[in-house]
Amino acid sequence: WIMGHMVNKIEQINEFLDLGANSIEVDITFDNLGYAEYTYHGFPCDCKRWCTNQENVKEYLNALSDITTPGNPKFRKEQTLVVFDLKTGGIDANRMYEGGKDFAGKILFDYWKGSENAGRAYIIISVPSIDHYKFMKGFRERFDGSAFKDLLLEKVGWDFSGNDDLDATRTAYQNAGIEALNHIWQSDGITNCIPRGLGRVNKAVSNRDSSDAFINKVYVWTVEKYSSVKDALSADVDGIMTNHPNVINGVLKEDEFKDRFKLATYEDNPWTTFKR
């Protein structure tokens, strides 16, 4: 999966798809009560990127639904997966659970349109700290008893993006009521302004490939330097988040990688584990 990074303006969705992305990451900000407000990253962000692009969350989700609904004139089959990078740090601790429930409602009614026939992209709910596991718990439990619980079970996956200890991350999922290997992506990364080694990535890949795994897939962010892309692919990651999807596509076509990797399509299930 080639994940376009920080795609916070509606018009940027097609821009990143045209560059070769098959998935996008969008930042979501919240007020202190846990209500999602804007697609916004803010300062600091990546080098050579504009940090202040934003949209109203409802308007963005509606536009994203159009782009991922077959039969809609705006439909783009390339858009298979969405990573919602949820800026939960400003939510009051006692409102984290309610924030998760509210955002689930926005996905249900603004993205899925209260229907099983709209917004087909798979979704990763990405939370920046294992201490915010109650957001995931609230999101999940919003669908308890719902006619749309099958959509949750089919379409939604999970990620803690704060580079936390992996054993502690496993415990956080248990606290959130999410079982091991239940659509879990593990991210690792840092801004493109600073180099980062692959030590934790290698540990995550080892967990993914082990008999005691809790991780289904591993992705790195934010990567676009040619040598860093090659290093990430050599580490057998499943996804790369990037500002330059065309660079990733170019490396994938090289002899070293063209028979080891393929660009994911909608028919490729993002919850299925592929081991080395």
UniProtKB/Swiss-Prot annotation:
A molecular-function term among this protein's GO annotations: phosphoric diester hydrolase activity
Tissue expression, as annotated, is: Expressed by the venom gland.
* Chain's role: Dermonecrotic toxins cleave the phosphodiester linkage between the phosphate and headgroup of certain phospholipids (sphingolipid and lysolipid substrates), forming an alcohol (often choline) and a cyclic phosphate. This toxin acts on sphingomyelin (SM). It may also act on ceramide phosphoethanolamine (CPE), lysophosphatidylcholine (LPC) and lysophosphatidylethanolamine (LPE), but not on lysophosphatidylserine (LPS), and lysophosphatidylglycerol (LPG). It acts by transphosphatidylation, releasing exclusively cyclic phosphate products as second products.
Main subcellular location? secreted
What residue ranges carry the coiled-coil annotation?
none
Supply the source organism's classification: Eukaryota, Metazoa, Ecdysozoa, Arthropoda, Chelicerata
UniProt-annotated location(s): Secreted
Q: What is the protein name stated in its UniProt record?
A: Dermonecrotic toxin LlSicTox-alphaIV1ii
Q: List the disulfide bonds.
A: C45-C51, C47-C193
Q: Where does Mg(2+) bind?
A: E25, D27, D85
Describe the reaction catalysed, as an equation.
an N-(acyl)-sphingosylphosphocholine = an N-(acyl)-sphingosyl-1,3-cyclic phosphate + choline; an N-(acyl)-sphingosylphosphoethanolamine = an N-(acyl)-sphingosyl-1,3-cyclic phosphate + ethanolamine; a 1-acyl-sn-glycero-3-phosphocholine = a 1-acyl-sn-glycero-2,3-cyclic phosphate + choline; a 1-acyl-sn-glycero-3-phosphoethanolamine = a 1-acyl-sn-glycero-2,3-cyclic phosphate + ethanolamine
BP terms from Gene Ontology:
killing of cells of another organism; lipid catabolic process
Catalytic class of the enzyme: lyase
